[in-house]
């Protein structure tokens, strides 16, 4: 066990690898317990969040205790078939999650600047 930990300490992982996985294309009726059965085989899990609103159905977040377990799960479960659906397993990216929000904020700021300087972008009639 100590030998394995020493080997892991020497491995450099890509920067996008982290302990949080984002899973898409899940069956809508999947439960957290079923997620634990599938993802728990790759290491101890700290938390699982399954989407239950119309916007988040079919998605989930899985947080592993160890980054190497998350990498192993991502490598092995991408494309895994669950109820005739092939899972899409990605590393969580905080920047991507807030990208839509940033776009709306920028559009609002642009609108305010246009109003401030009297710029009209409507096409001429």
Swiss-Prot record:
It is found in: Nucleus. The keyword Translocase does not apply. PROSITE patterns: RRM. It holds the Pfam family RRM_1. It comes from the Eukaryota. GO terms for molecular function: mRNA binding; RNA binding. There is a cross-link at residue 29 (Glycyl lysine isopeptide (Lys-Gly) (interchain with G-Cter in SUMO2)). Residues 19-94 form the RRM domain. GO terms for biological process: blastocyst formation; mRNA splicing, via spliceosome; U2-type prespliceosome assembly. The modification N6-acetyllysine is found at residues 29, 41. Residues 16-29 are annotated as: Interaction with pre-mRNA branch site. InterPro entries: Nucleotide-bd_a/b_plait_sf, RBD_domain_sf, RRM_dom, RRT5_SRSF_SR, SF3B6_RRM. GO terms for cellular component: nucleoplasm; nucleus; spliceosomal complex; U12-type spliceosomal complex; U2 snRNP; U2-type spliceosomal complex. Keywords: Acetylation, Isopeptide bond, mRNA processing, mRNA splicing, Nucleus, RNA-binding, Spliceosome, Ubl conjugation. Its main location: nucleus. Component of the 17S U2 SnRNP complex, a ribonucleoprotein complex that contains small nuclear RNA (snRNA) U2 and a number of specific proteins. Part of the SF3B subcomplex of the 17S U2 SnRNP complex. SF3B associates with the splicing subcomplex SF3A and a 12S RNA unit to form the U2 small nuclear ribonucleoproteins complex (U2 snRNP). Within the SF3B complex interacts directly with SF3B1. Component of the minor spliceosome, which splices U12-type introns. Belongs to the SF3B6 family. Component of the 17S U2 SnRNP complex of the spliceosome, a large ribonucleoprotein complex that removes introns from transcribed pre-mRNAs. The 17S U2 SnRNP complex (1) directly participates in early spliceosome assembly and (2) mediates recognition of the intron branch site during pre-mRNA splicing by promoting the selection of the pre-mRNA branch-site adenosine, the nucleophile for the first step of splicing. This is Splicing factor 3B subunit 6. It comes from Homo sapiens.
